[in-house]
Amino acid sequence: MTPQVASDSAVPWPRRRTQAVNIGHVTVGGGHPVVVQSMTNTDTADVVASTKQVAELWRAGSEMVRLTVNNAQSAAAIPRIAERLAMMGIDVPLIGDFHYNGHQLLADEPACAEVLAKYRINPGNVGFGKKRDLQFGQLIECAIRYGKPIRIGANWGSLDQMLAAQLMDENNRRKQPWDAAQVLREVLICSAVGSAERAVELGLPRDRIVLSAKVSGVQELIAVYRDMAARCDFALHLGLTEAGIGSKGIVASSAALAVLLQEGIGDTIRISLTPEPGQSRTQEVIVAQELLQTTGHRAFTPMVTACPGCGRTTSEFFQELAKTVQQHVRDKMQVWKITHPGAETMTLAVMGCVVNGPGESRHANIGISLPGTGEMPVAPVFIDGEKSVTLRGENIAQDFIALVDDYVERRYARFPD
């Protein structure tokens, strides 16, 4: 299915020109829609648990899923995970996350090398000393042999120490030395871009390379990616590393990525949230989708506008209805994206009183203005800007959801009656 992009009027900024990289059946960069990816946190060697989590992430909307490949057992598990996913009818590109020993694992487990859609390589720990160039070359040779793209992902938590020492020495010789943060950014960028250019020299085509350079500070990340985007034409993967738990992680990631996306920088994103105990891993996928949709880059599910509530809305009914409607349309999109293409661009409004309720509802495709405190117990519904019907009684929620479903059927059905 072709990913839906918001209307041109919602995305006035130009996208950065990059190479287009094919990762399985997904294309990243080259003007294609920004892709959502995620990562498992299971022991990859546990085939059952890993398959289950990949499936959950895919059902939530992840378009690529990365798995840790850190030992022989996890490398051997990758083909079995892919086989189980295929039996479930799930076709999602699997990305192998390699550190330290990827060259050896891919050589020892050719089935793993063949099944993976992309290899993630960390230039900071691909090898040390004299082994660095050798082991990096072996990874690139494997990518060439199997026709796989790579992501060269630098991270300030695992910097290339030799490169860092070199750039520190050069900085000390400057007449006006840079501050430490600026040198750190330069190390990250040189590590990623320099490794990519070396991969090209070794024979890997430019359109099989994605870059990332992650830090955990919002302003540092923005500065790194602005600079890196200006220095190369490789597709870029965005992510704030170790963003944190709960609302802090969501806010930090959104603050950084929204700025870069607004400037046309970024071809694929991941929201690196620390899950709370017992929380589903799928939250990072939902947040990534909502970020892309609220910034006008993609459309995944109908968006529900709802007021925050005030003294006029002492009843919790409008809050409950907004939550119910949001969950209803998200659940329905599993089917609607096939049978009713375009439904994901629909806007809904669930408002709590007469002040902004009718006006906001008119702006939506379909909206409802519920009665506030002291108002008449009626709820006018507006469809495409016009008042359509007034709902009353105890079944307002069910009646409104029925109107939403009817609207989707009439407007977006692929095969209308």
From Swiss-Prot:
[4Fe-4S] cluster binds at residues 307, 310, 353, 360. Its cofactor is [4Fe-4S] cluster. Its EC number is 1.17.7.3. Gene3D superfamilies: Dihydropteroate synthase-like (3.20.20.20), Sulfite Reductase Hemoprotein, domain 1 (3.30.413.10). The keyword Iron applies. Keywords: 4Fe-4S, Iron, Iron-sulfur, Isoprene biosynthesis, Metal-binding, Oxidoreductase. It comes from the Bacteria. Belongs to the IspG family. NCBIfam families: ispG_gcpE, PRK00366.1. HAMAP family: IspG. This is 4-hydroxy-3-methylbut-2-en-1-yl diphosphate synthase (flavodoxin). It comes from Xylella fastidiosa (strain 9a5c). The gene is ispG.
